[in-house]
């Protein structure tokens, strides 16, 4: 199994969110391929599911995930190489907003819980696939910190679009 470093510090980092943001620049999308079993494979799998592909969210980039990535690349007119790289991620992530439900929302909620990005396990969004008030609060707080400290182009609107997804998925890796 490949355990490549994707983006940012390794899983298990306990840096506070503000410390992360102080040094944060827009990280490149991670490169994921068959054999990987590192963050953010679960996010990739959730987004594939959100796009209609049947794949388990198990954190392992196995044959089923590889087939789903290749199928998505064909559907999207991308180079079919089975690698989830910048172009695949940019086409794959689903814009979500308050009131939305489903696997893309679950991905976001998992990301906020990953290494306690939410700031407090007690306040972390419940992973239920519903973009409710608690999830929106975390999105807006995260966007505001990003806007103030690292990426002034980030709009604080509670909508998770391409740039917000890239920041959330790549901020810790």
What are these model-derived regions, one by one?
Residues 1-173:
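Cell-envelope/ECM-targeting effectors and their regulatory/trafficking segments
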């Amino acid at each position: 199994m490949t355990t490549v470093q994707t983006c940012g510090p390794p899983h298990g980092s306990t840096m506070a969110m503000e410390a992360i943001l102080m040094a944060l620049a827009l990280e490149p999308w991670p490169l994921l391929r068959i054999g990987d079993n590192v963050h953010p494979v679960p996010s990739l799998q959730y987004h594939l599911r959100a796009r209609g592909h049947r794949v388990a969210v198990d954190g392992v980039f196995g044959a089923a995930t590889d087939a789903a990535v290749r199928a998505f690349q064909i559907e999207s007119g991308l180079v079919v190489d089975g690698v989830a790289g910048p172009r695949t991620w940019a086409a794959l992530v689903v814009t979500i907003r308050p009131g939305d439900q489903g696997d893309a929302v679950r991905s976001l909620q998992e990301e906020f819980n990953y290494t306690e990005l939410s700031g407090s396990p007690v306040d972390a969004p419940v992973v239920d696939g519903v973009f409710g008030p608690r999830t929106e609060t975390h999105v807006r707080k995260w966007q505001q910190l990003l806007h103030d400290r690292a990426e002034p182009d980030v709009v604080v609107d509670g909508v998770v679009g391409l740039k917000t997804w890239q920041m959330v998925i790549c901020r810790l890796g």
